[in-house]
C-alpha cells in the first residue's frame, strides 16, 4: 500500500532480533553494530572486540514471536561464547520460536549447535555470512572471522545433517558474488541473499579505520558496486531461484521492497 514504510536491514529477514553480548571478537571493519556502539558510547573502537555478556539477557525467558527471530544481529557466535550461546538459543527454541541463526561460522560452533538441537531442525534456519570466495579478502575486512574454507565446511556440514541452510552475501566484499553462488548453491536449501556494503566510508571512519589502505580498498569496493555493475550482476543471477536481493540492490534494479517485517523475500 502506498505510504507504508519499507523494511530494510535485519527486518527483511525477521520480525525481531535477539542478542546477549556487547562487542564482537570478529571485529569486522564495516560493522554497523560497532558503529552504533561507538556512537552511543557503549563501546570504543579499541575495546569492541572484547565481548561482555549481558547476564540478564542471557537468562531471559522468551515468548513465541509472530514470525522468525534473528539471532544474533549485533554480535556473532564464537567458540569462546558458545556455552552461553547454547543456553540462549535453547531459551529461544523452547518457547516455540523459529530462529534464523546468522553467523560467520566456526566449525566448532556449527557442529555443537547441530548436535545439541537436532530435534529442532524444523525451527532453525542457518544463514552463513560469506561475502567473498577469497580468504584474503575476508581476512582484510573481517580480521578475526573464519576463512572461506571453514565457512564452506560449516555449510556442507549443516546441509548434510538435515538443517535448513542459506547464505548472506551482504556485504559483498568484492565483485565475485556469482562465484559464491556457483560454488555453494548445491548446499543451500533456502536462499542466497546478496547486498551491497552500505554507508561504508562513514562506518569505517566511526570505527576508527581511516588509514590509507583501508580507505582505498573501500573506494575500490564502492566502485565494484556501481549501479551499472549491480545491474549486470542482477542480469546474470536473476534466473537463479535461490538468489534473493537485499534492499540495497532492489533499489538499483527497481524491485519492489517489502513493507512487512520478516517475510524473507
What does each model-found stretch correspond to?
Residues 1-68, 252:
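N-terminal [4Fe-4S]-dependent radical SAM core
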Residues 53-236:
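Conserved AdoMet/S-adenosylmethionine-binding subsite of the radical SAM
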Residues 13, 43, 73-76, 103, ...:
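Generic ordered-secondary-structure signal
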Residues 228-265:
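C-terminal accessory regions of radical SAM enzymes
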Amino acid at each position: 500500500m502506498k505510504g507504508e514504510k519499507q523494511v530494510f536491514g535485519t527486518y527483511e529477514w525477521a520480525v525481531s532480533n535477539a542478542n546477549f553480548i556487547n562487542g564482537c571478537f570478529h571485529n569486522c571493519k564495516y560493522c554497523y553494530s560497532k558503529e552504533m556502539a561507538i556512537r552511543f558510547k557503549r563501546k570504543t573502537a579499541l575495546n569492541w572486540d572484547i565481548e561482555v555478556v549481558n547476564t540478564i539477557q542471557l537468562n531471559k525467558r522468551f515468548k513465541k514471536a509472530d514470525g522468525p527471530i534473528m539471532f544474533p544481529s549485533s554480535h556473532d557466535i564464537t567458540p569462546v561464547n558458545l556455552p552461553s550461546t547454547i543456553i540462549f538459543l535453547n531459551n529461544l527454541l523452547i518457547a516455540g520460536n523459529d530462529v534464523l541463526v546468522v553467523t560467520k561460522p566456526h566449525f566448532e560452533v556449527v557442529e555443537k549447535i547441530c548436535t545439541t538441537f537436532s530435534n529442532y531442525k524444523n525451527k532453525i534456519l542457518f544463514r552463513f555470512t560469506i561475502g567473498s570466495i577469497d580468504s584474503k579478502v575476508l581476512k582484510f575486512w573481517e580480521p578475526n572471522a573464519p576463512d572461506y574454507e571453514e565457512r564452506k565446511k560449516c555449510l556442507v556440514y549443516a546441509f548434510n545433517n538435515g538443517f535448513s541452510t542459506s547464505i548472506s552475501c551482504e556485504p559483498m566484499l568484492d565483485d565475485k558474488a556469482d562465484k559464491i553462488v556457483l560454488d555453494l548453491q548445491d548446499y543451500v536449501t533456502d536462499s542466497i541473499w546478496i547486498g551491497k556494503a552500505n554507508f561504508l566510508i562513514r562506518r569505517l571512519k566511526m570505527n576508527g579505520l581511516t588509514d590509507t589502505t583501508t580507505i582505498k580498498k573501500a573506494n575500490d569496493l564502492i566502485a565494484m558496486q556501481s549501479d551499472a555493475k549491480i545491474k549486470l550482476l542482477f542480469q546474470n543471477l536473476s534466473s537463479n531461484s535461490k538468489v534473493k536481493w537485499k534492499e540495497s540492490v532492489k533499489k538499483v534494479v527497481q524491485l519492489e521492497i517489502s513493507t512487512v517485517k520478516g517475510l524473507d523475500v
